[in-house]
Amino acid sequence: MCIRDSGYLRAELDVRPDLWFFDGHFKNDPCMPGTLMFDGCLQAMSFYLAASGFTLPRDGWRFRPVAELPYQLQCRGQVTPSSRRLVTEVFVEEVVDGPFPTLFADLLCTVDGLKAFHARRVAIELVPDWPLEAMPALLAEAAADTRLMKRYGGPGSRATR
């Protein structure tokens, strides 16, 4: 069920030449990776869903892009050490409530007022992050290490005595 058909979020970053990502992208051509701009947009979308109250009844859940949808990402500019400001904008098109709340939005990043990144109708959803089924070896290891259980609140711990 669609509960909202529009919304807006804006985030700004003052760019400094000493930011961590400049040294790690292109040799002798420092810039922010376009994938990092996209990740910042996804984080802003996640914040929007969380601020809308969708995480309150879903403790332990996480955000992920909707994998079944194709996305067209356009990088047309760069954030460089001489840039002054990166602005990330999320133009919410639709918020769908249901078993997995989903947000659909257009994304735009501008650098010093010039369009640098655009993505049309990107979707992010809130999904359970438990039980841990993706890495059964971690579950087995945790079950075998009863010291952690006893120390941090499991059966036989100081907290339950």
Predicted regions and their residues:
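Hydrophobic beta-sheet segments that form the core/acyl-binding groove
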Residues: A67-K115
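Short helix/loop capping segments that flank catalytic or ligand/cofactor-binding pockets
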Residues: L19-D23, F100-P101, F117-R120, V127
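Soluble ligand-binding/transfer domains with enclosed cavities or grooves
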Residues: S6-A11, D29, D39, A44, ...
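Catalytic strand-loop segment that frames the active site of acyl-thioester-processing enzymes
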Residues: R4-M32, A159-R161
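Active-site helix/loop of acyl-thioester processing domains in fatty-acid/polyketide metabolism
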Residues: C31-G60
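Active-site loops and adjacent core secondary-structure elements that bind or stabilize anionic groups
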Residues: M1-C2, G113
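Short, basic/aromatic beta-hairpin or loop at an interaction surface
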Residues: G60-A67
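Segments adjacent to and within acyl-thioester-processing domains across lipid
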Residues: L114-R161
